[in-house]
A protein has these predicted regions:
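Zn-dependent metallo-beta-lactamase
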Residues: 1-41, 429-445
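Pre-active-site segment of Zn-dependent metallo-hydrolases
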Residues: 16-59, 66-71, 127, 151-163, ...
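Active-site-proximal loop/helix segment associated with metal-binding centers of metalloenzymes
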Residues: 28-29, 34, 119-140, 150, ...
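Active-site metal-binding motif and surrounding structural segment of the metallo-beta-lactamase
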Residues: 33-80, 160-190, 399, 474-479, ...
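Rieske [2Fe-2S] iron-sulfur-binding domain
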Residues: 65, 439-561
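Cap/insert and terminal regions of metallo-dependent hydrolase folds
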Residues: 78, 155-257
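Metallo-beta-lactamase
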Residues: 82-142, 244, 251, 260-265, ...
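Feature captures hydrophobic
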Residues: 270-459, 465-472, 478
């Protein structure tokens, strides 16, 4: 197996059974904040343009580069698709021209043309942009695990695919914390030191658990070339900086008694066999070392090459074109109204300072209104041009744009609250309902509601929509109006697919008069479903809003039981 490192998390894997292009990233990301480090400007893109397979682990822009994928990768390529509950990644890939997809199941190996592959998918709201994944590859001679920046939880599943000969993984920071927070200097230093230590220790723990013979640090760090962010770079191995480079992690591994790490830079080619891993760099060894020992000089030259590009991107941001308050009120309030568990998790005010516009997201009243100095738990200060951009383009995941850009300031009172950031990545009804359903399923008791003489599970078995809000019942058929999936109340049978089932239970006649409303375990009254427009109870045999078509997929066999 031959593996060309193409920068950041990017790999081009060549085997006798075919090639796989993984997470290619070339263009700046997050409002021109992130650039690949070291630079991959000299990669010959034509050599990686015709892979047999493409693997994009998730939708973060340092992994999913739509401009590169659209302009440089053959659309005859088959995409290896992770098992995500929402089809956001597939939609993004279709938007740039891909039409051939191999859909995988989480943790289930598949053999294609002599290659044995497995994608391990993480699907919690906190996992990437509602999904992150790693790829295991076995070419019959050696096995590798491309973890990139995913955080797998089922390590036994990964072990069953192994043992592994090589392991590619993230070790460095990929977040805005703590730099954007307005902390005192000593506190900032302590938090940065703790974050850096935790990153390195977590990566080392993963290497021990996976147990690969060879370890290659990847998926970071990026570099920051805009003057506004330039100080975030770790120029001198600062123990308080959250962006240590590859050489820092390799030294850390050696200090912990693990000398099996290998440095790869863009253009490096590794040849992996059962007897070793030989890396050839695209430049002399002393030049490779200089990238890291003279990082200030290297980044100064890199910055000079990108200065005009950064200026052009910043000049393109809209300014004064959008009524921010009115737009966010129209956009956010319907979402907040449906975000019962998210709102309960936030349980406070979030203030957004957008220059002349200062507004409150009030998760008590589920309203958006001008800020008049009220107390808050979270405070964000944004360049209003960035918020205008997000509104103009109706960006449904702000984490994947403005937050990862690090182009903001923040304050918070108390501990980190994941519900706040998860709300900002769920700015569509589909995304929000998935997150709400995920939270609900983690509750100790599954909530039921009552309608038309039945007790019914509250969350749709398809993508977890809240059926107390999105169900329409007619002629004994419940239709989830979010995606159009239908279920027979008498049996719970799904009429759209034969691999899902809705829990239903008839209510005894003597109970129905007393049960005018269902009550949640926390005491909140569940409302009856809102009336939804319908054309009748005609049966749909597919989902019209996502990729799922049951006619294309056989019924799944039951498996044995077995920030910051």
């Amino acid at each position: 197996m031959q593996i060309t490192f193409i920068g950041h998390a990017g790999l081009f894997i060549e085997t006798k059974h075919g090639s796989i292009l993984c997470d290619p990233w070339f263009n700046s990301a997050y409002f021109a904040s992130w650039f690949p480090f070291p630079s991959n400007e000299d990669i010959d893109r034509s050599k990686i343009a015709n892979p047999d397979y493409l693997f994009v682990s998730h939708l973060h822009h340092d992994h999913f580069d739509p401009e590169f994928l659209r302009d440089h990768v053959s659309k005859d390529t088959t995409v290896l698709l992770p098992d995500y509950p929402l089809d956001l990644l597939e939609r993004g890939l279709r938007d740039v021209g891909f039409t051939k997809f191999l859909r995988t199941k989480n943790g289930v190996p598949v053999t294609v043309d002599g290659l044995r592959l497995m994608i391990s998918a993480a699907v919690a709201p906190t996992d990437g942009p509602l999904g992150d994944s790693g790829l295991s590859v076995d070419d019959g001679e050696v096995r590798i695990f491309d973890q990139n920046d995913s955080r797998p939880v089922d390590l036994d599943m990964l072990a069953d695919f192994g043992p592994y000969d090589a392991h590619f993984l993230q070790f460095s920071g990929a977040i805005w914390y703590p730099m954007v927070y307005l902390y005192p200097e000593k506190m900032m230093d302590a938090l940065g030191r703790k974050k850096r230590d935790n990153e390195l220790a977590r990566a080392l723990r993963f290497t021990k658990e996976i147990g690969a013979t060879h370890i290659i640090p990847s998926a970071g760090p990026p570099c920051f070339l805009d003057d506004d962010l330039y100080g975030f770079n770790d120029f001198d191995r600062d123990p308080k900086n959250i962006f240590p480079d590859q050489t820092v992690f390799l030294d850390y591994m050696r200090a912990q008694g693990h000398p099996n790490g290998h440095l790869m830079i863009p253009g490096s080619v590794g040849t992996l066999t059962k007897t070793g891993y030989i890396v050839e760099h695209p430049m002399p060894e002393e030049q490779v070392r200089a990238i890291f020992t003279d990082k200030r000089g290297y980044l100064a030259q890199y910055q000079a090459r990108k200065r005009d590009e950064i200026a052009a991107i910043k000049a393109s941001w809209p300014r004064g074109q959008v009524d921010i308050l009115a737009s966010l009120r129209e956009w956010f309030e319907p979402l907040m109204d449906k975000a019962d568990l998210t709102a309960a998790g936030i349980n406070s005010l979030v203030v957004m300072d957008c220059g002349e516009t200062k507004l409150v997201l009030d998760f008590h009243t589920r309203k958006v209104y001008p800020w008049q100095g009220e107390e808050y738990d979270y405070f964000f200060r944004f360049d209003p041009a960035l918020i205008e951009y997000l509104i103009v383009h109706h960006v449904e995941d702000w984490i994947n744009e403005v937050f990862l850009s690090c182009r903001f300031q923040a304050e918070r009172k108390g501990a980190y609250n994941e519900y706040v950031y998860n709300f900002f990545k769920c700015l569509s009804m589909e995304r929000l309902q998935y997150a709400e359903g995920y939270y609900a399923e983690k509750a100790p008791v599954q909530t039921l509601w009552e309608s038309d003489g039945y007790r019914i599970q509250r969350r749709c078995p398809h993508l977890k929509a809240d059926l107390t809000r999105f169900a329409h019942i007619e002629d004994g058929v419940l239709t989830c109006t979010l995606h159009g999936w239908q279920f027979e109340l008498a049996t719970g049978r799904c009429l759209t697919s034969d691999d899902r089932r809705l829990y239903t239970q008839p209510i005894a006649m003597d109970e129905r008069n007393e049960a005018s409303a269902a009550t949640r375990s926390d005491g909140a009254v569940l409302h009856t479903p809102m009336e939804q427009p319908t054309s009748g109870a005609s049966i749909r045999d597919r989902c019209y809003d996502c990729w799922y078509d049951p006619k294309k997929f056989p019924t799944r066999k039951k498996q044995p039981v077995g920030e910051e």
